[in-house]
Amino acid sequence: MKKYHLFTLLFLSMLTSSAIGQAYDYCDTKTLKDSCKDYIDKPYKYDASNIILVTLQKKAQMKEVELPMFMGESYKLIFNTYALPPGVEIHVYNKDADHDNRKELFSCNSSGAKKMFVFDTEHFHSKLYVDYVIPANRAAADGSMPTVQGCAVMVVAYK
């Protein structure tokens, strides 16, 4: 019985690690994250990072990430969009998508030549919301839908 449980546990862990490895095959997140850290200069210190995996679908998508902040602290958000497909927009807001009166604090786009973006928070908020607006996948000339994937890395630093 113990061998059965051990075998099952081993099989599940291999299956899980295989699935995780496949999810990141198209995205070298460590390299992207390390390049973001190069933009952290004193007196800022590394706090956290976020990886967003993107697969273009038939319809446009929006993914929102909530960032809790400490009131009175200054933050720096560093975005690396080298591995994003063209057309993905990144917007930073003071409120979530459910609020009509939210204010856009920062935005950038993955389509241009510039791929590294830095946002220094001069406003003190308890939370920031990062919205990734992902365009719809366009069909190829033969009508097939090619798989378009990518990722972005956001690093948060505080002062």
Segments the model singles out, each with a brief description of its role:
Residues 84-99:
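Short, surface-exposed beta-strand/strand-loop-strand elements in extracellular ectodomains
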Residues 4-15:
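Sec-dependent N-terminal signal peptides
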Residues 74, 85-89, 150-151:
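Exposed beta-strand and adjacent loop surfaces of beta-rich binding modules
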Residues 22-43, 123-159:
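C-terminal edge strands of extracellular/lumenal beta-sandwich accessory domains
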Residues 64-67, 73-82, 130-132:
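Hydrophobic beta-strand segments within beta-rich accessory/binding domains
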Residues 49-53, 98-107:
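Surface-exposed loop/edge segments in extracytoplasmic proteins
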Residues 48-70, 74:
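Non-catalytic, beta-strand-enriched accessory regions in extracellular/secretory proteins
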Residues 110-125:
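Beta-sandwich interaction modules
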